Every structure is written in structure tokens, then in C-alpha cells.
């Protein structure tokens, strides 16, 4: 959905744009191709590996920071308002495909899952040090698993005998919760739970969305791709109401005062795109314009 996501920004040739999930640089390249010589693009990525993809273009600045700090680092670069922000949430293909990062269920690797090596908390810490209450919380809240308590207890029971060091160890501990017909799906939910906790993904997303309102100029666009229901729920609510919970205030005439105008309906990838990139199957694109 690269074209649709960048189309959603309604790019002005001399505008200022932000790609907060630079990754391999695909979206940034497309944005730059539509900008004129006076346009500017800022990329954010906390992953040190992403710097290998930095683009040699004087209109482009790559900021090696988490996008939860978008306002601070745009200000640091002399930017108070922007015309569009793009976010492609979740784990990049590179992160999934490098075994030692520990993101994928396909490889045996140390339990890491950090999107930045600067972060102290790893998947190993969570699996081996979190108590039953917190393990249950992340599996129930972030994995939406009905048997979260049983999974938490199984992990604690296993680690009392020996540390759970790598992904293969974790799979063995979880084996009884992985029926053949659903093993991949359930394991993915458990991995997702741990990864979200390691990287504080829900808190980061909330902070980013709130700051997007502050840095977007009037008429500026927000284009966001999410990959699971937790992310999409937050994005949908925020774009609709400017809030994560509750209802917005009403004006004198009883109309809800909302900061965004929704642009079109939610977009999902075509069957053709899913055939080319199976990881896109759960993607949902939402676009909004600041009033």
C-alpha cells in the first residue's frame, strides 16, 4: 500500500513531511520523488540498522530516535509545523528476517526483541523476571489470549528449573498451548505480547498520536498503517475523536468538536499485494486531515 499511504499525505512540492518509521526507506523514497527542491523530509528510526539505508538527498534528514519524541526532535531541527506525517507501525521486514534480533518464531535466537539496542529491557528479562501478575497482564492485554494465566504459570514453572534463554526454549515451554492447527497463530500472539512490552509500543503510539496534533499544520495529513487490532483501535479512535477514550466536547450547537477530518475509508491491501508480500495481509491504512 505504498502508493495509497503516500497519496494520503496529499504532498505539496514545497512541504515539510515526516516518515516516523523510516526502516528500509521505501516510503521516504516515494515522498522525496514527489517533493520539489524546496521540500523537506525528516525520517525517524530508533533501529541502528536503519542507518545503513540513509538516503543521500539534501532534502532528507534521518533522526535516530524513537518517534515518541517527534515534537522534541523536530523542534531541535528548527521545525514547529509539518504538512504530513506517515507511520507504518509494527516490525520491519529486516527485523523479522535477522535471526539474532529474536523477533521471528522461525529462528532459534536469544530472547531479545528490542527495536533499539539502547533499550535495557529485553524479552529475556520479561520471560525470566516478570511475576505472574505482569506476565498474565501482557498476554491478556497485548496478545488477547484467553488462557493468559495458564501460559504465565507455565513459564514461571519452567524457569524455576532453568533459565529460558532462547526462542527454542520458549517454544518448548509453550508446546502444550500450541495445537497443530493453531500453533503459528497462538505463538505469534505470545511473541507479539512480549515484543509490545519490550518496546512499550502502545505507550509510544499514544504519545506519538497526541504529538501529531501539535506538530501538524492546519490541513496537514496523518497517514497510518497498523497491523493488529490494538494499534488500529487506538488510531481509529484518535482520528475520529482526538481521544483514546470517552467522547469529545460539544460546541455551542451541540456538535462534537473533533480535531481531524477523516479522509476516505480504511484501506486494506489488495489480493495481489498480499500474494507479493504476505506480511501485508493484516495491514490497515487510515488517513486523517487536521482541521
From Swiss-Prot:
Binding positions (S-adenosyl-L-methionine): 25-27, 45, 73, 88, 95
Protein's job: Specifically methylates the N4 position of cytidine in position 1402 (C1402) of 16S rRNA.
GO terms of molecular function: rRNA (cytosine-N4-)-methyltransferase activity
Xref: InterPro entries: RsmH, SAM-dep_MeTrfase_MraW_recog, SAM-dependent_MTases_sf
UniProt GO BP: rRNA base methylation
Enzyme Commission code: 2.1.1.199
Lineage of the organism: Bacteria, Pseudomonadati, Bacteroidota, Flavobacteriia, Flavobacteriales
Reactions mediated catalytically: cytidine(1402) in 16S rRNA + S-adenosyl-L-methionine = N(4)-methylcytidine(1402) in 16S rRNA + S-adenosyl-L-homocysteine + H(+)
Subcellular localization(s) per the UniProt record: Cytoplasm
Keywords per UniProt: Cytoplasm, Methyltransferase, rRNA processing, S-adenosyl-L-methionine, Transferase
Gene this protein is translated from: rsmH
GO CC, one annotated term: cytoplasm
Top-level taxon: Bacteria
Listed PANTHER family: 12S RRNA N4-METHYLCYTIDINE METHYLTRANSFERASE, S-ADENOSYL-METHYLTRANSFERASE MRAW
Family assignment from sequence similarity: Belongs to the methyltransferase superfamily. RsmH family.
Enzyme's top EC category: transferase
UniProt-recorded name of the protein: Ribosomal RNA small subunit methyltransferase H
Amino acid at each position: 500500500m505504498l502508493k495509497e499511504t503516500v497519496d494520503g499525505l496529499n504532498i505539496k512540492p514545497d512541504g515539510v513531511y515526516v516518515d516516523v518509521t523510516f526502516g528500509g526507506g521505501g516510503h521516504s523514497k516515494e515522498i522525496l520523488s514527489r517533493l520539489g527542491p524546496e521540500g523537506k523530509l525528516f525520517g525517524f528510526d530508533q533501529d541502528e540498522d536503519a542507518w545503513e539505508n540513509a538516503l543521500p538527498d539534501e532534502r532528507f534528514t534521518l533522526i535516530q530516535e524513537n518517534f515518541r519524541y517527534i515534537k522534541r526532535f523536530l523542534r531541535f531541527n528548527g521545525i514547529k509545523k509539518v504538512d504530513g506525517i506517515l507511520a507504518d507501525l509494527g516490525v520491519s521486514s529486516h527485523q523479522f528476517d535477522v535471526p539474532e534480533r529474536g523477533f521471528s518464531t522461525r529462528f532459534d535466537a536469544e530472547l531479545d526483541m528490542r527495536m533499539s539496542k539502547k533499550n535495557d529491557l529485553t524479552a529475556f528479562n520479561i520471560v525470566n523476571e516478570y511475576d505472574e501478575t505482569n506476565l498474565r497482564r501482557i498476554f491478556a492485554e497485548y496478545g488477547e489470549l484467553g488462557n493468559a494465566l495458564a501460559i504465565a504459570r507455565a513459564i514461571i514453572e519452567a524457569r524455576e528449573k532453568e533459565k529460558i534463554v532462547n526462542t527454542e526454549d520458549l517454544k518448548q515451554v509453550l508446546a502444550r498451548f500450541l495445537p497443530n492447527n493453531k500453533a503459528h497463530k497462538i505463538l505469534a500472539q505470545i511473541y507479539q505480547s512480549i515484543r509490545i512490552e519490550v518496546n512499550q509500543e502502545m505507550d509510544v503510539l499514544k504519545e506519538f498520536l497526541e504529538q501529531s496534533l501539535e506538530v501538524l499544520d492546519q490541513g496537514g495529513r496523518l497517514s497510518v498503517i497498523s497491523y493488529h487490532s490494538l494499534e488500529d483501535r487506538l488510531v481509529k479512535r484518535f482520528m475520529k475523536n482526538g481521544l483514546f477514550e470517552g467522547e469529545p466536547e460539544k460546541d455551542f450547537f451541540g456538535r462534537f468538536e473533533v480535531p481531524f477530518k477523516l479522509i476516505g475509508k480504511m484501506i486494506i491491501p489488495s489480493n495481489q499485494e498480499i500474494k507479493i508480500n504476505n506480511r501485508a495481509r493484516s495491514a490497515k491504512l487510515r488517513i486523517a486531515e487536521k482541521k
